[in-house]
Amino acid sequence: MMLMDTSLIGAINLTIHAFLVGSLLLGLHRKIMARIQGRPGPPIIQYLLHTLKFYVKEITFPITAGNPLYIFVALLDIAIWLAALIIAIDFKSSLLIIIGIYVLQKIVEHGCGLSSGSPYGKIGGVRSVFSAAAEVPLFAVVAAIYLTTHSVLISDILSYQEIHGSLLFKMPICAFAFFILLVSKAPNSPFGIVKGKDIVSGYMTEHYGLLGAIIYIAEAIAYFVLLWLFIAVFIGPLVINSPVLTLAVMVVMTVILAFVNGLTPLLAPHHSVMLQMTIAGLVLCDVLYRLIVGG
């Protein structure tokens, strides 16, 4: 019982840490993008303030909403990323499980859009199906990592890098493909077709109040998890074993992502899909090469 209580407290602490760090990094991302565009921008704590603002607002339901699904998708969203957080960082389990959980995010995006009854939400939900092309390179990346490290467990990948060095320079194409995933998940991404400005907030347009706060919390945790995964898988234990170094690298990566997103226009849905499928093709070529040469 004591061990279970300790594990529960540890999971709660990890969740709070991930939310706070993810929120501040998203706030930094927004601040840098504003400076790039010649604006002073909001304070770095703006994402936290937005979350708190939605949290205290009254819950109302659009008259066109399908209430059971409308509520369920928000709860599913945070459940998905809490599971990813615990499985990745606490258990250091399989990358395949993490990617499987990540793919479930498309159900949330599609469900959010369709459940509200809003035309903007519906378009965002439909676009989420197109954006599933971003997941194709992920499976190829995992295949390439397995051929190199002979494991898909995060703990084994970290152990491999302790002996053989970082995978960042051994697998640059795979690292680039994963980086594109980070770009697609960051705010105002050129690949952000599901929440493009032309459809207001996309699938999130009609979610506000407590449900909106839940989605904001989930997005902050998601951003933290994906940054952590990139650092763990491609940079290795030299950084990931130090919380200070991990945070520093997350800040650097957020700055890079902000510059990429701030200087790149939003792609049309078909251009976004074509580009990400091209990246998937490059990773598949890398996988075939590793199969031929033996890892």
UniProtKB/Swiss-Prot annotation:
Catalytic activity: a ubiquinone + NADH + 5 H(+)(in) = a ubiquinol + NAD(+) + 4 H(+)(out)
EC number annotated for this UniProt entry: 7.1.1.2
Main localization (coarse): membrane
Cited Pfam families: NADHdh
Cell compartment(s), UniProt: Cell membrane
Membrane-traversing stretches: 8-28, 69-89, 129-149, 163-183, 199-219, 220-240, 243-263, 273-293
InterPro entries, per the entry: ComplexI_Subunit1, NADH_UbQ_OxRdtase_su1/FPO
Membrane topology: Multi-pass membrane protein
Gene Ontology MF, one: NADH dehydrogenase (ubiquinone) activity
GO BP field: anaerobic electron transport chain
GO cellular component, one term: plasma membrane
Superkingdom of the organism of origin: Archaea
Keyword field: Cell membrane, Membrane, NAD, Translocase, Transmembrane, Transmembrane helix, Ubiquinone
Alphabetized PANTHER family for the sequence: FORMATE HYDROGENLYASE SUBUNIT 4, FORMATE HYDROGENLYASE SUBUNIT 4-RELATED
Family, similarity comment: Belongs to the complex I subunit 1 family.
Name of this chain's protein: Putative NADH-ubiquinone oxidoreductase MJ0520
Organism: Methanocaldococcus jannaschii (strain ATCC 43067 / DSM 2661 / JAL-1 / JCM 10045 / NBRC 100440)
